[in-house]
């Protein structure tokens, strides 16, 4: 993409009402534009990042055996009345009437819809287990939307729902999602701590939140320090095997959000030098809730003995749009965003310091073409701007590599490369520079 033709409306200063770093930088980098309180248009740069995060989530769900569906944003109120949650959800639910006076709602979550789909088609234990997931826009009418995409009213969410014959099978599904979530966050360059959590309006018997540490986080976290350094399970685990040891390894150490914190247990279970109290951002929430939805909604299957039984369910949510802000909160500096390579909107930028000068243009085009051929999704900064302005805007939006082409370097047969994450610069022949970026 040539920056002279791209739409990237950067700002020199963030609006005064942007309170946290991620909101400020997303506005300054031209990633989003607020259209109403808690509702944002996603501009090209922001959409590229959003789509990359969505794809990482999708790949890890598929790897763990979940199956993608797409459910509607508008849902029938009658389904929520059937589950008993229509009145319980309160003012956060946006209620709508169509022209026929039928009650609808803009879905804040999808347990009812997915259970309705399941009960229409699945009738036997032989068709279990099933785990269906959906990446869709949701709406919760927050009283005080704030912090940009971190706490908006409209948000993109991945929600998965597992259906199993009994509690033991449901716990296996829960463990698969537990491990898959840790793999998602690792691929996004995040260190996530799983903590026991309150089940809230979703309900259920077992729940974990996944929290990344950030000073601006809304949650307070009490945890054993070893959890911060514990790696993700990785892609090569046996998804059909017993994952309980992997889960236990990460849950036997104390970790709790403020709602579930027990100070006496914390002091007993974690040595003083291992106790960590910090603020964090919730980036995922998983639940096992047994028959909470299947029983009132009559979602049953015939068991091996022919007798019908209610299925056991779990629910697993990741805020995809929220993750954009969370990554920025965890990875930025004074100059702007520092994206992990996995979600950067562009893999590298070729910076032409003298557009219109034939020799410089030729080397810049050569570098741009080579990076395209290598699949690096390069950006060619061919704008007629001062070098300092070019460097500042590319640092702001977080492009991981800059390959800088200027007349002096071209005359000497070299270019300069800069690694955004470290600030390290090297002067190299073009072939060596391309090799370093594409390695």
Curated annotation (Swiss-Prot):
Gene Ontology MF terms: ATP binding; proline-tRNA ligase activity
Enzyme class: ligase
Listed SUPFAM superfamilies: Class II aaRS ABD-related (SSF52954), Class II aaRS and biotin synthetases (SSF55681)
Domain of life: Bacteria
Gene3D superfamilies from the UniProt entry: Anticodon-binding domain (3.40.50.800), Bira Bifunctional Protein, Domain 2 (3.30.930.10)
EC number: 6.1.1.15
Location in the cell: Cytoplasm
Record key words, sorted: Aminoacyl-tRNA synthetase, ATP-binding, Cytoplasm, Ligase, Nucleotide-binding, Protein biosynthesis
Pfam families registered for this protein in UniProt: HGTP_anticodon, tRNA-synt_2b
One GO cellular component term noted in the UniProt record for this chain: cytosol
Gene Ontology terms describing biological process: prolyl-tRNA aminoacylation
Matches recorded under InterPro entries: aa-tRNA-synt_IIb (IPR002314), aa-tRNA-synth_II (IPR006195), aa-tRNA-synth_II/BPL/LPL (IPR045864), Anticodon-bd (IPR004154), Anticodon-bd_dom_sf (IPR036621), Pro-tRNA-ligase_IIa (IPR002316), Pro-tRNA-synth_IIa_bac-type (IPR004500), Pro-tRNA_synthetase (IPR050062)
Catalytic reactions on record: tRNA(Pro) + L-proline + ATP = L-prolyl-tRNA(Pro) + AMP + diphosphate
HAMAP family hit by this protein: Pro_tRNA_synth_type2
Subunit note: Homodimer.
Cited function: Catalyzes the attachment of proline to tRNA(Pro) in a two-step reaction: proline is first activated by ATP to form Pro-AMP and then transferred to the acceptor end of tRNA(Pro).
Family, per entry: Belongs to the class-II aminoacyl-tRNA synthetase family. ProS type 2 subfamily.
Protein name, per record: Proline--tRNA ligase
Species annotation: Phenylobacterium zucineum (strain HLK1)
């Amino acid at each position: 993409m040539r920056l002279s033709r791209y739409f990237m409306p950067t700002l020199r200063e963030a609006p005064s009402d942007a309170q946290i770093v991620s909101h400020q930088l997303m506005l300054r980098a031209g990633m989003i534009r607020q259209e109403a309180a808690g509702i944002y248009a996603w501009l090209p740069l922001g959409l590229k990042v959003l789509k990359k995060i969505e794809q990482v989530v999708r790949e890890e769900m598929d790897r763990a055996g979940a199956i993608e569906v797409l459910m509607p944003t508008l849902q029938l109120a009658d389904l929520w009345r059937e589950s008993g949650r229509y009145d319980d959800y309160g003012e956060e639910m946006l209620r709508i009437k169509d022209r026929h006076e039928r009650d609808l709602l803009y879905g804040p979550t999808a347990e009812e819809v997915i259970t309705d789909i399941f009960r229409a088609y699945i009738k036997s234990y032989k068709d279990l287990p099933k785990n269906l997931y959906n990446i869709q826009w949701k709406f919760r009418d927050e009283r005080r939307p704030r912090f940009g995409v971190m706490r908006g009213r409209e948000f993109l969410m991945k929600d998965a729902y597992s259906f199993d014959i009994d509690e033991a099978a449901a716990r296996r599904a829960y463990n698969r999602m537990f491990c898959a979530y840790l793999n998602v966050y690792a691929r996004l360059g995040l260190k996530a701590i799983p903590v026991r959590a309150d089940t809230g309006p979703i309900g259920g018997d077992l729940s974990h939140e996944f929290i990344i540490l950030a000073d601006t986080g809304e949650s307070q976290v009490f945890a054993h320090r070893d959890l911060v350094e514990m790696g993700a399970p990785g892609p090569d685990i046996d998804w059909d095997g017993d994952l309980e040891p992997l889960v236990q390894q990460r849950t036997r150490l104390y970790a709790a959000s403020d709602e579930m914190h027990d100070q006496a247990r914390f002091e007993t279970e974690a040595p003083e030098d291992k106790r960590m109290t910090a603020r964090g951002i919730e980036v995922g929430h998983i639940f096992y809730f047994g028959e909470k939805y299947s029983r009132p909604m009559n979602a049953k299957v015939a068991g091996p003995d022919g007798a019908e039984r209610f299925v056991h369910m779990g629910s697993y949510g990741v805020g995809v749009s929220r993750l954009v802000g969370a990554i920025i909160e965890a990875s930025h500096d004074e100059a702007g965003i520092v994206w992990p390579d996995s979600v950067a909107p562009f893999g590298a930028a070729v910076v032409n310091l003298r557009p219109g000068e034939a020799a410089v243009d030729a080397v810049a085009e050569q570098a741009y073409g080579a990076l395209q051929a290598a699949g690096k999704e390069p950006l060619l900064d061919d704008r007629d701007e001062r070098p300092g302005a070019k460097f500042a805007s590319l640092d702001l939006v977080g492009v991981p590599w800059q390959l800088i082409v200027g007349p002096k370097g071209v005359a000497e047969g070299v270019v300069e490369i800069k690694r955004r994450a470290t600030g390290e610069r090297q002067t190299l022949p073009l072939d060596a520079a391309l090799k370093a970026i594409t390695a």
